[in-house]
Swiss-Prot record:
Pfam entry (one): Peptidase_M20
UniProt name for this protein: N-acetyldiaminopimelate deacetylase
Reactions the enzyme catalyzes: N-acetyl-(2S,6S)-2,6-diaminopimelate + H2O = (2S,6S)-2,6-diaminopimelate + acetate
Biological role stated in the UniProt entry: Catalyzes the conversion of N-acetyl-diaminopimelate to diaminopimelate and acetate.
UniProt-annotated catalytic positions: 69, 128
Superkingdom of the organism of origin: Bacteria
GO biological process: diaminopimelate biosynthetic process; lysine biosynthetic process via diaminopimelate
Keywords (A to Z) from UniProt: Amino-acid biosynthesis, Diaminopimelate biosynthesis, Hydrolase, Lysine biosynthesis
InterPro entries, A to Z: AcetylDAP_deacetylase, Amidohydrolase, Bact_exopeptidase_dim_dom, Peptidase_M20, Peptidase_M20_dimer
Record has Amino-acid biosynthesis as a keyword: yes
Pathway membership: Amino-acid biosynthesis; L-lysine biosynthesis via DAP pathway; LL-2,6-diaminopimelate from (S)-tetrahydrodipicolinate (acetylase route): step 3/3
Length: 376
């Protein structure tokens, strides 16, 4: 059975997921497609493994931006798709193949029927890490075409097709990676008094970290520390010289993130003293909260509800992390959830978004952009 042009594009992209700042095939695919649209009104820039496209308006007074993240995840796919990933151990398990496809669809509509204002499309690498939004925002390439308004979307498996969900103000949390390396003294399991066990030290640290949430964060605020991975030791009868904890920190407020990190550092210092070991903390990538511009979001929700076929839901904030938050620090705009009705959630090896959502998103976003970017 034949599929639509943009469903096919999504399937093409789904086959070639690549991790952050290694999206060379994805970048080339985007450039090849844009090459079919080029005319005197379209300009293209390459930034690292990303692409920035400008469509000149007929009588521009402002620049409207659309951001699509393009990277995949280090997950082995289990969808059973005929168009499953051909890159072993990598998958588009967060919907960035849909985000990119919708961006290309919106770009196609913009080239076909130009509006008054300029449009800029940001095909951004490395959202899943180490973070592409902030360096792209600071790049010379984008500074020349910096939008006055910017929007982005994220697929939502829990919402039905034909639905969007968003809210004014805080939408997504502040997030930070967390890595703690502990180094003590290894030894024979029969002589624990001559060694310094970093498995035991790591176990104490994991337990103590949870007290930060229950005793150091305002209960009316929200924060989560998750340790998702612990490594240490070599065999069962050798006391481990080293251990490593890997996790994430998520807070709704910026103030809580600072407080949580301060307490983590104090607890780790206590572990060093208690177990006579050395500890190193690395926070890795940190993403700023996604805070939607109130007036623009309210206007967008009203427009979509009254003038399109989409259903609009006012959702609650989520502990999800998104580096789009950095763009919203600098540029007024908003992000919204796009319903794709999947049994399996984000970052799951069996995530299967309903492809019907692609065309619906292109259509209603094109309606919104034309309305927002055309003088009445």
């Amino acid at each position: 059975m034949a599929v639509s042009k943009f469903v096919q594009i999504r399937r093409d992209l789904h086959k070639i997921p690549e991790i952050g700042f290694e999206e060379w095939k994805t970048q080339q695919y985007i450039l090849d497609y844009i090459g079919t649209l080029l005319n005197e009104h379209v300009e293209v820039k390459v930034w690292r493994t990303g692409v920035i496209v400008k469509v000149k308006g007929k009588n521009p007074e402002k620049v409207i931006g659309y951001r699509a993240d393009i990277d995949g995840l280090p997950i082995t796919e289990e969808t059973g798709y005929e168009f499953a990933s051909v890159h072993e151990g990598m998958m588009h398990a967060c919907g960035h193949d849909l985000h990119t496809t919708i961006g290309l669809g919106l770009l196609t509509a913009a080239v076909t029927e130009r509006i008054d204002d300029d449009l800029v499309f940001l095909f951004q690498p490395a959202e899943e890490g180490p973070g592409g939004a902030l360096p792209m925002l600071e790049s010379e390439e984008l500074k020349e075409w910096k939008p006055n308004i910017i929007l982005g979307l994220h697929i939502a498996p829990e919402y039905p097709v034909g639905t969007i969900a968003t809210k004014e103000g805080l939408l997504f949390a502040n997030t930070s990676e967390l890595y703690v390396d502990l180094k003590g003294k290894g030894g024979h399991a029969a002589y624990p008094h001559t060694a310094n066990d970093m498995i035991v030290a790591a176990s104490h640290l994991v337990t103590q970290l949870q007290s930060v949430i229950s005793r150091n964060v305002n209960p009316l605020d929200s924060a989560v520390i998750t340790i998702g991975k612990i490594t240490g030791g070599t065999v069962q009868n050798i006391i481990a010289e080293k251990s490593r904890l890997e996790g994430t920190i998520r807070t709704l407020s910026v103030e809580s993130m600072s407080r949580v990190k301060s307490r983590i550092e104090a607890i780790v210092a206590g572990i060093e003293a208690s177990f006579q070991c050395e500890a190193v903390i690395d926070y890795g990538a940190m993403y700023h909260q996604v805070y939607n511009h109130e007036a623009l979001t309210r206007e967008f929700m009203q427009f979509v509800s009254e003038q399109t076929d989409m259903k609009v839901i006012t959702c609650t904030e989520a502990m999800t992390g998104e580096d789009f938050g950095y763009m919203l620090q600098e540029i007024p705009g908003f992000m919204f959830w796009l319903g794709v009705n999947s049994e399996y959630g984000l970052h799951h090896a069996k995530l299967k978004p309903d492809e019907e959502a692609i065309e619906k998103a292109i259509v209603f976003l094109d309606q919104y952009v034309k309305w927002k970017g055309t003088r009445k």
